[in-house]
């Protein structure tokens, strides 16, 4: 049976804006109050996904969340008509309104952690939505994320869906952005790397001082237990607290893996050699550890260009390619390194550049926009087929974006009651296009 790694990219929602909500995310904060273009953002993401589908990669799409989130605004005391709720919130608590209008669910690397059936004791694909408790605007996502994932991976014979972890900082969980998987072939049992920022229950353990560590060891271990992983399938690695304090808020900003390749910055982890040795013990195959030295790419350049927030994909030829943002081309040190990388003895033989600037300006590169799901042929057949990207779905989604999305949005526009109507009309139509059923609150 054939095995693949599918990518499920998040469709950018109609309220994509730059509100600077993510403390610890340098790009998000530095671009706060820019005028956004939701239509361009959605099309950039869709075009990147289609390009991968055209390369033969199994590519799916995940629906965005309903925003503005009036249900959260009502929970915190705003009342009256929908328009009045927005008006009150804009006047009395504009930062809370911004949080309830964020399109951050586009970054599906944070949607969930996924363990393929080759790794799990029950032989099913496991999904645990991330609780995202560290950021208010993301902490309101998990319940809807779970519904969207269940509507997408909708056959319980193959897919096991868990609830998100308890909503407490001790179990801070940011999903696949702090998780990668190494293996010989996608269908073989692999080693899942769980990267954490701190131990919540050990006050003496290292942790960052300036920015929060969003992922705890306790959360990572809980997900591994839920997913029925054996010790031989897991390696728990602490991210270097110093790089978190330099803006590396998720591990996918400083490292990325694919099959037998781990591509990472020399400052990415604590106890790097010890953990590499553990990976080698647990995974008996030829491995490529590509360590990028600070002398060639500084942490600042890595964060600014998102060198590591790239996708590494395996092409039909067996060679690997890096899917990079055009920002990597615009950074001389990073471009020089990537050109050098292609001359080294590794499986990576191509670098392909994509313009995802609308996402980049909010702190999310190509890797943020996708959730990786290693699957076999039967599992792919069991997925909701209306979520898999082909020419027909691409054209329908492109038309849908053109019809429903604005090409200009400011944070002041978030108080416009018309935005509620536009967003709900768009999502209602999308849920029919993708045959999702009633995944949104307004549909219940």
Swiss-Prot record:
GO molecular function, one term: N-succinylarginine dihydrolase activity
Coiled coil start-end: none
Keyword annotations: Arginine metabolism, Hydrolase
Single biological process term from Gene Ontology: arginine catabolic process to glutamate
Positions with a binding annotation for substrate: 19-28, 110, 137-138, 214, 252, 362
Entry-linked SUPFAM superfamilies: Pentein (SSF55909)
Catalyses which reaction(s): N(2)-succinyl-L-arginine + 2 H2O + 2 H(+) = N(2)-succinyl-L-ornithine + 2 NH4(+) + CO2
Annotated active site: 174, 250, 368 (nucleophile)
EC class name: hydrolase
Annotated NCBIfam families: arg_catab_astB, PRK13281.1
Subunit structure: Homodimer.
Functional note: Catalyzes the hydrolysis of N(2)-succinylarginine into N(2)-succinylornithine, ammonia and CO(2).
Protein name: N-succinylarginine dihydrolase
Organism: Shewanella putrefaciens (strain CN-32 / ATCC BAA-453)
Gene this chain is encoded by: astB
């Amino acid at each position: 049976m054939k095995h693949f790694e599918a990518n499920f990219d998040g469709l950018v929602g109609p309220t994509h804006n730059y509100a600077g909500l993510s403390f610890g995310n340098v790009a998000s904060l530095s671009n706060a109050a820019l005028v956004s273009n939701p239509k361009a953002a959605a099309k950039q993401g869709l075009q990147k996904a289609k390009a991968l589908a055209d390369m033969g990669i199994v590519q799916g799409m995940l629906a965005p969340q309903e925003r503005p989130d009036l249900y959260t605004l009502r929970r915190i005391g705003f009342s009256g008509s929908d328009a009045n709720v927005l008006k009150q919130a804009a006047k009395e608590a504009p930062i809370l309104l911004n949080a309830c209008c964020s399109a951050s669910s586009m970054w599906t690397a944070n949607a969930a952690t996924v363990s393929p059936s080759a790794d799990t004791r029950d032989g099913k694909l496991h999904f645990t939505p991330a609780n995202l408790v560290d950021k208010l605007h993301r902490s309101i996502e998990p319940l809807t994320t779970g519904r969207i994932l269940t509507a997408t991976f909708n056959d319980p014979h193959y897919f096991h869906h868990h609830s998100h972890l308890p909503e407490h900082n001790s179990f801070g969980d940011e999903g696949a952005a702090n998780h990668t998987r190494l293996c010989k072939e996608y269908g073989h049992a692999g080693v899942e790397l769980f990267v954490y920022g701190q131990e919540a229950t050990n006050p003496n353990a290292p942790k960052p001082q300036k920015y929060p560590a969003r992922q705890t060891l306790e959360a990572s271990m809980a997900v591994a237990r839920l997913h029925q992983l054996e010790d031989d399938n897991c390696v728990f690695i602490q991210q270097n607290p110093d790089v978190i304090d330099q803006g590396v808020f998720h591990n996918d900003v400083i490292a990325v893996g694919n099959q037998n390749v781990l591509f990472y910055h020399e400052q990415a982890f604590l106890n790097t050699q010890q953990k590499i040795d553990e990976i080698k013990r647990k995974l008996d195959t030829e491995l490529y550890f590509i360590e990028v030295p600070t002398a060639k790419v500084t942490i600042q350049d890595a964060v600014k260009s998102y060198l590591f927030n790239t996708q590494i994909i395996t092409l039909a030829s067996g060679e690997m390619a890096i899917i990079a943002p055009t920002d990597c081309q615009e950074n001389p040190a990073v471009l020089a390194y990537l050109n050098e990388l292609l001359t080294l003895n590794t499986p990576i033989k191509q670098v392909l550049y994509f313009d995802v600037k609308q996402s980049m300006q909010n702190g999310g590169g190509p890797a943020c926009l996708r959730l990786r799901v290693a699957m076999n042929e039967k599992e792919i057949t069991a997925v909701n087929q209306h979520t898999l990207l082909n020419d027909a779905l691409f054209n329908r989604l492109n038309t849908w974006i053109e019809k429903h999305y604005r090409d200009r949005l400011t944070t002041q526009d978030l108080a416009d009651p018309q935005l509620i109507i536009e967003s709900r009309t768009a999502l209602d139509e999308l849920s029919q296009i993708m045959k999702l059923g009633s995944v949104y609150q307004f549909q219940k």
